[in-house]
Amino acid sequence: MSSGSLLLLLGLLTLLAELTPVSSRKRHPDCDKPPNKKRCTGHIPAFYYNPQRKTCERFSYGGCKGNGNHFKTPQLCMCHCHE
């Protein structure tokens, strides 16, 4: 395969990956869990995915263990959880 063909194939595969709908990507396994609002010493602004509203909402993460349904930004939350 020539280098030009290989470059074209690589470009097409990259385009295909970018056009793949988010719904076909694997969701974070904890997205359906409620946010862990246990009060610990931390008051860390975070976002959790609300599956009923299909959006990410802000909450105060205490910093103690918790589950995976807490993200630093709403963009990360939506990227990992939105269907």
UniProtKB/Swiss-Prot annotation:
Pfam families: Kunitz_BPTI. Keywords: Disulfide bond, Neurotoxin, Presynaptic neurotoxin, Secreted, Signal, Toxin. Expressed by the venom gland. Disulfide bonds join 31-81, 40-64, 56-77. GO terms for molecular function: serine-type endopeptidase inhibitor activity; toxin activity. Its main location: secreted. InterPro entries: Kunitz_BPTI, Kunitz_BPTI_sf, Prtase_inh_Kunz-CS, TFPI/VKTCI-like. Belongs to the venom Kunitz-type family. Beta-bungarotoxin is a presynaptic neurotoxin of the venom. The B chain is homologous to venom basic protease inhibitors but has no protease inhibitor activity and is non-toxic. This is Kunitz-type serine protease inhibitor homolog beta-bungarotoxin B chain. It comes from Bungarus flaviceps flaviceps (Red-headed krait).
